[in-house]
């Protein structure tokens, strides 16, 4: 399978929605339609501190992977940080280098933006993804705690 990684475009909406639905299903998550709409708008707005990349099958032109990143300030560096918030590969394209290519494209963009670090979280049970992540980054050993606003 041949594919290319590129920036998300407005005409990608149907393919992006399909991948996004697969990502939410994978994590057994539900999202309000308004949140999906705002997320889509933010990903395409150049004034937002975020970006999205997609992997496109070179033959069918179907989207087979996505990654969303947020660029933000931190307290441990004067340079911005790149938070890789979402990464998903279509089931039909897994174990073909799509995830790795998306991460490498994020690294390249973060380097262009002079980010001090690129980082992300994954669920501890996501063993398949963790095998890849262990090859392309180091596990910082932190445990995430959170409180959702009531």
Which sequence ranges carry the predicted segments?
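Conserved acetyl-CoA pyrophosphate-binding loop and the N-cap/start of the following alpha-helix
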Residues: 93, 97-105
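Conserved active-site alpha-helix within GNAT-family acetyltransferase domains
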Residues: 100, 124-143, 147
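Acidic/polar helix N-cap motif
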Residues: 9-12, 90, 126
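Conserved GNAT acetyl-CoA-binding A-motif
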Residues: 111-122
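Residue-level recognition of the GNAT/N-acetyltransferase active site
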Residues: 72, 85, 90, 94, ...
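Charged catalytic carboxylate motif
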Residues: 15, 35, 101-102, 128
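Acetyl-CoA-dependent GNAT
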Residues: 3, 7-13, 18-79, 85, ...
């Amino acid at each position: 399978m041949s594919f290319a990684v590129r920036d998300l475009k407005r005409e990608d909406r149907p393919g992006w929605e399909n991948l996004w639905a697969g990502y939410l299903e994978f994590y057994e998550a539900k999202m309000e339609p308004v949140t999906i709409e705002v997320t889509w708008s933010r990903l395409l707005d150049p004034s937002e501190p975020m970006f999205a990349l997609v992997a496109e099958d070179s033959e069918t032109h179907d989207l087979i992977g996505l990654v969303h990143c947020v660029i933000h300030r931190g307290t441990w560096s004067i340079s911005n940080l790149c938070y890789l918030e979402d990464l998903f590969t279509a089931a039909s394209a897994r174990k073909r280098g799509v995830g790795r290519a998306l991460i490498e494209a994020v690294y390249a963009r973060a380097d262009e933006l002079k980010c001090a670090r690129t980082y992300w979280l994954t669920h501890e049970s996501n063993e398949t993804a963790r095998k890849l992540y262990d090859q392309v980054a180091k596990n910082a050993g932190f445990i995430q705690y959170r409180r959702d606003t009531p």
